[in-house]
Amino acid sequence: MGLEQSLSEETKEGEPSQKDQIELVIRLDDPGFCHSANMGLKKILEQGTCSSVSVIVATPWLDEVAELLRSHPEVSVGAHLVLNSEWKEFKWGPVSPYTEVSSIVDAFGKFFGSRRELMAQAPKVEEVEKELRAQIDLGLKKGLNFAYCDYHMGAAVNALEFQEIVEKLAGEYRIGISRYFGEKDTESIYSVPPDKKTDKAIEVLENLPPGRHLMVCHPGMNYPEMAAMTDLNSFGLKEMSVHRQAETDALCDPGFREVIRKRGIKLINYNHLRKEELHLMTRPFTAKPLEEVVRQARMEKKLERADEAGKK
C-alpha cells in the first residue's frame, strides 16, 4: 500500500475512528552518503514502504539521490543535518569552506567521527549555524524540496544552543522538525540481528497503540562499497552493510505492507504535517547548555585516555 493511497482513502465502515487511529511516519535516514545507501532507498521507493527521506547533503552522492527523489514526489524530503562523519574509511566535511568553520572540523577539514570529539573542541555557535544553513541552502539548490529537517547522530541538537539554531532555521525556511509533531519513536530494529529484522519490524507494527509514531530506518545494499566501511563509534554495528540490507528487505517484505493494511495504519509524511500543523510544533526535549556538554565531553575523553594508558 503506497503513501498516496493511504493519505487519500476515506474512513470506511469497520475502519478505526480518529481517536483509535494509528498514524505512522516511516523515515529513511542517510541517503546521499554513498551509492549503496541510495540504491537501498531506490529499492524501497520502488518495491517497499516509506513516507519520508532524510538526505545528508554534505556527502559525495548527493546528486544521485536528488535525481532519484525527483521521480518520487509522494514522499517528503528532509535535510538530515550533519556535524559528524563516522566512517573510518570514508570521511566527509562541511558544505561551508572548512577554514570558515574551523571549530567543527579536524586538521584535515573533515567532520569529527563522534559527538564527543566534536563537543570536546568547544564548537563555535556561529560556525554551527553557518554550516547548517549552508546544508539547507545546498539541498534546495539541488532541487530538494525540504519539508522538514532532523539531525544525524543527534549532533545538531546535542547542545541547547545548537537546538535553538535548528529551531531558528526551521522557522526561517518554513519547514518542520522531525519529532516536533508529537510523533513517538517506535521500537528500533537498528541493532536487531539481520535475519530477524523483518519479523521484528512486523512485530513492531502489530503492537503499535493508537497515536502518532515514527519508525526510523537506514536503507542500504550489501555492496562492497558499504561493506568496506567501519564505524568509528563504539556502538557502531559490525557488518553494517548486512544490517542495512536487512532493513531494506524488511520494508520491502509483503508481510510488512500487509500488517499496515490489516491494522488500518495511516502512513503520513512531513509534507502533510508541514502544511497542516507547522504552527503546532512542540519541542520534545531540551538539550543541555553547550558549556556543560563541552565540559562533559572533555572529561570523558580524559577518562578514556587514562583508561588506555592503564592498559599499556
Show which residues each predicted segment covers.
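Catalytic domains of cell-wall/extracellular-matrix polysaccharide-remodeling enzymes
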Residues: 122-202, 206
